[in-house]
A protein has these predicted regions:
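Post-transcriptional modification and biogenesis factors for structured RNAs
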Residues: 171
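Walker A/P-loop
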Residues: 17
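ATP-binding Walker
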Residues: 13-14
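ATP-dependent small-molecule kinase phosphotransfer cores
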Residues: 26, 30-123
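A glycine- and Lys/Arg-enriched "phosphate-lid" helix/loop adjacent to the NTP-binding pocket
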Residues: 99-166
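Hydrophobic anchor at the beta1->P-loop junction of P-loop NTPases
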Residues: 6-8
């Protein structure tokens, strides 16, 4: 049996990471084999890219950010997601392709056609289910600020986060 690929999407502080625990508990009760993962940042390459992408010390252009995200995603799919799905294991990912449309397309105002082209060229897998966590930006950012330190994305101005939320909502319709 092929596993299921479920992605969790939403702005910073929307509750994705917290909800992973609830999903894991439900799958445990149903005796379903699963792994929890995240983007960016699964595996050694992913962890390195995550550090580069989230560090406030790095000034990265939107184009470079997009290419690094897509490189991480392709590696994540090939090395972790697809092998587990083929072994019947469910994969629950904190972020996936919708985050690129939201953050780079909406937040960074990049051409969505470029994201479409990269996605198609890389033959990216479509999730079986995507769950969007939506709440007002002000509330989500307030929740994110309660963490130990803010990353490069969390420090962006509120209009950046409003554009991200708008794209998420549009993609969910």
């Amino acid at each position: 049996m092929k596993g299921k690929f479920i992605t969790l999407e939403g702005i910073e502080g929307s509750g994705k990471s917290t909800s992973l625990e609830d999903i894991a508990n439900t799958l445990d009760k149903k005796s379903i084999d699963y792994i929890l993962t995240k983007e960016p940042g699964s595996g050694s390459l992913g962890n390195e890219l995550r550090s580069l992408l989230l560090s406030s010390d790095n000034k990265i252009s939107g184009e470079v950010e997009l290419l690094l995200m897509m490189a991480d995603r392709k590696n994540h799919l090939d090395s972790l997601v697809i092998p587990n799905l083929n072994n019947g294991i469910w994969v629950i990912s904190d972020r996936y392709l919708d985050s690129t449309y939201a953050y780079q397309g909406g937040g960074r105002k990049m051409d969505v056609a470029l994201i479409d082209e990269l996605s198609s060229s890389l033959n990216l897998l479509a999730p079986d289910l995507t769950i969007l966590f939506d709440l007002p930006v002000e509330i989500a950012l307030d929740r994110a600020k309660r963490r130990a330190s803010l990353d490069r994305f969390e420090k962006e101005p509120i209009d950046f986060h409003n554009r991200i939320r708008d794209i998420y909502k549009a993609r969910a319709e």
